[in-house]
Design a protein with these regions (language model features):
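Glycine-centered tight-turn and secondary-structure capping sites
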Residues: 26-28, 184
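General beta-strand structural signal in soluble alpha/beta enzymes
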Residues: 43-46, 93, 119
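Acidic beta-strand-to-loop metal/phosphate-binding motif
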Residues: 12-21, 91-95
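Acidic, metal-coordinating catalytic cores used for nucleic-acid/nucleotide bond scission
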Residues: 18-26, 72, 97
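A contiguous loop/helix-start segment that scaffolds small-molecule binding in enzyme catalytic cores
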Residues: 11, 90, 97-208
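Short, hinge-like loop/turn segments at secondary-structure boundaries
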Residues: 8, 31, 57-62, 110-111, ...
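Class I SAM-dependent methyltransferase SAM-binding "motif I" and its flanking Rossmann-like core
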Residues: 29-87
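Short, small-residue-biased leader/transition segments that mark boundaries at the very start
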Residues: 1-7
Length: 208
């Protein structure tokens, strides 16, 4: 209510000492209130950890998504990553220093230890640092030193063309699809299309 009164009396400038205002930041509520009250809102381009970390990562920037902060608890975090397991775009996250190691542990578990990623901290500041490698390599790195500063983590999206599935993996996935009520024929077709593999291979596994 007080902020709304200020809007009607003067020009308001929203600034922050922690990156771009309103990006994974409660400042968006002030912007929404101004818009809802009929005020004109303008943005001055400034530094953004999202695009800066992406540029430093060396990972694909053709398509990317910003996911903010992952859940704090291990169970919720793992479940959250499971929802992103099929994401093909490069993913960008923010994380607090005391949770970086646990974040990487969960990410390696769900996305795979070999998934390429990068970690950037203190960007545009004196102690700026970017470390690149697999999720497992980054996890080991995070355990070997004290985590200080604000972190932005970039993880490569799923590359379906490079995936390798064992017969056991395909058999389990096929069983799961049939468990949803699909006929075996439809389950075979759906699995082959989703994983971009031949129907013949899935058919042979289904009839072993």
């Amino acid at each position: 209510l007080e902020f709304r009164r200020v809007l009607f009396r003067s020009r308001v400038l929203l600034i922050t000492d922690a990156g771009m205002p309103t990006v994974s930041d409660p400042g968006y509520r002030a912007v929404r209130m101004a818009i809802d009250s009929g005020f004109e809102v303008k943005a001055l381009p400034g530094p953004s950890a999202v695009t800066t970390a992406l540029a430093l990562s060396g990972l694909s920037s053709d398509r990317f998504c910003f996911e903010g902060f992952a859940p704090r608890s291990e169970i919720a975090r793992n479940r959250y990553f499971e929802e992103l397991k099929e994401e093909e775009r490069t993913m960008i996250f923010f994380e607090a220093p005391h949770r970086v190691c646990e974040f990487l542990k969960s990410a390696a578990l769900v996305f795979g230890e070999k998934r390429p990623a990068s970690i950037s901290r203190e960007m545009t500041k004196t102690h700026e640092e970017t470390v690149r490698g697999s999720l497992e390599e980054l996890r080991l790195w995070s355990e070997s030193k004290e985590m200080l500063g604000e972190f932005t983590i970039v993880i490569e999206g799923l590359d379906r063309d490079s995936l390798e599935y064992s017969d056991a993996d395909l058999a389990r996935r096929l069983k799961d699809l049939e468990g949803t009520g699909l006929s075996r024929r439809d389950a075979i077709a759906k699995l082959a299309k989703e994983l971009r593999i031949s129907k013949r291979r899935v058919f042979d596994i289904a009839h072993q």
